[in-house]
C-alpha cells in the first residue's frame, strides 16, 4: 500500500461492523461526515470492481475507492440505507402484486445494465439478502464479492 493509499484510508473512521461480517464496516469520512461502507475482500475480481467504479451504474452502490493491500482489496462504497428483500419478506411474508412487479422490473433493469456491458458483469450470488430496497423505492444490488 502506498503512502497516498494509507492517507486515503486514514480519512475514514470505523463506526461498527455490519451484520455478522467481520470484514464489512460502516465508516464515516472524517472531513465530510458522510457515511460509507468499507469492505475488506480476500476473494475478488479487481477488473469487475474497477469497471463498477468507473461506470457508476444506477442500482449499484457507487464505489469511491479501491485499494490493494497484500492479497486483499479494500473497497469504499456508498452506504445504501434501506432493508433487504429478505428482511421485507420476513416482515410481510407476501407482497402486493403491483409492488412485487415494480421491484422485479427495477431489478431486471439493473441486471440488464450489468449484462449488456462489454465484458458483461455477472453477479453470481443474487439472493434476497443482496437486494436492498430504499424508502425512495429504489432497488440496489450489493455484494459482488
Locate the predicted segments by residue.
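ATP-binding glycine-rich loop module of kinase domains
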Residues: 20-44
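Activation-segment/catalytic-loop signature of the eukaryotic protein kinase fold
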Residues: 66
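Conserved short submotifs of the Hanks-type protein kinase catalytic core
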Residues: 70-84
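AlphaC helix of the protein kinase catalytic domain
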Residues: 85-95
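Activation segment signature within eukaryotic-like protein kinase domains
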Residues: 103-104
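Protein kinase catalytic-loop region centered on the HRD/HxD motif
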Residues: 109-121
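Conserved protein kinase catalytic/activation segment
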Residues: 130-141
